[in-house]
């Protein structure tokens, strides 16, 4: 049986998925990873637990199909350090919408 080298990868990079950030908990920076199945305009936004928008990491930029990594440095849209706590990161790519929680610990 023929086995492709990428058969051992846990995620098919051509499926829509929002993965766990790494590290989590984090301080001062974390990586947010996602994969999309086709070229899409992507939005990736960070919210606090009150639902307030904290930071926009991607605002409608076009991404190709595959696996992508975006860094967040724990700063809000004004460049200020955000306090310790739980944050939600939400992706929208075409009709795909997903969110996950992450924990910033100082």
Q: Which residue ranges define each predicted feature?
A:
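Conserved small/polar residues in nucleotide/adenosyl-binding loops
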Residues: 1-5
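Glycine-centered coil/turn sites that cap beta-strands in beta-rich domains
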Residues: 6-22, 26-47, 56-59, 69-72, ...
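Short, surface-exposed loop/turn motifs with a glycine/proline- and acidic-biased composition
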Residues: 58-94
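Extracellular and select intracellular beta-sandwich modules with Ser/Thr-enriched
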Residues: 96-100
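Short beta-strand edge segments in extracellular beta-sheet folds
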Residues: 102-106
